[in-house]
Regions:
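Protruding loop/beta-arch "assembly-hinge" segments enriched in small, turn-prone residues
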Residues: 2-3, 188-205
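Low-complexity, small-hydrophobic/phenylalanine-enriched stretches
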Residues: 153-185, 189-195
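Hydrophobic packing positions characteristic
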Residues: 2-166
Length: 205
């Protein structure tokens, strides 16, 4: 392609150009591609959370769209996106998102509005729409601030659990091994001040 034609292709970005059929084809192709929703970074602006089968978020895309005239178009909120939870069967780790979290919205290939928590068999699409932002899911945990409550699995085969406000366990705790609290072993600690009768021991050592 000559230098003159290259300049013309780059300078004409709309369907009305008569300089090159390539421009027209390129314009139409880009418009078709722009209608295909894949994934986009988002910010959480609303949360419907809980310990039920599913939670939802409302999100705002963090990247503006571009019009045919190369002008920025402000995005609008996307509503009622199911958010990801680490779960297998009836066991789960529940970390509900909060307003202000950043993550990734991904979009299904077809209308999946007919699929819900009770679905066990393939369903017909709810409509003929495809690759639409109406069929989004939210994956959290991208580009957020440092956490203050976390579980850290380390390469030395230890686990560090940090929860400055305390830990609540609902159930029986079984420990295969020792428990050490403030340097005192549960299995091998001793007590002083032991006398027969109704006396009490001193604290553990």
């Amino acid at each position: 392609m000559s230098e003159a034609k290259t300049t013309a292709v780059q300078a004409n970005n709309d369907i009305y150009t008569g300089t090159s059929s390539y421009n027209t084809f390129n314009y139409l192709t880009r418009n078709l591609i722009n209608d295909v929703a894949t994934a986009i970074p988002v910010k959480v602006v609303g949360v419907q959370a809980g310990t039920g089968s599913v939670g939802y978020v409302d999100v705002l895309p963090l990247v503006t769209f571009v019009s045919g005239a190369n002008k920025a178009v402000q995005p609008v909120n996307l509503y009622h996106l199911p958010y990801y939870r680490i779960q297998g069967g009836n066991a789960a780790i529940i970390i509900d998102p909060i307003i202000g979290d950043k993550g990734l919205a991904i979009f299904a290939q077809a209308d999946c509005s007919t699929v819900n928590a009770d679905t066990t068999e393939p369903q017909q699409p709810g409509s003929k729409r495809t690759h639409s932002q109406s069929d989004g899911f939210y994956l959290g945990g991208f580009l957020n601030q440092s956490p203050s409550c976390f579980i850290e699995l380390k390469q030395d085969n230890t686990i560090v659990l940090t929860a400055n406000s305390g830990i609540t366990i609902n159930g029986t705790v079984t420990v295969n091994g020792d428990v050490v609290a403030n340097g005192i072993s549960l299995s091998t600690h001793t007590h002083g001040g032991v006398d027969t009768g109704g006396g009490s021991t001193s604290g553990p050592q």
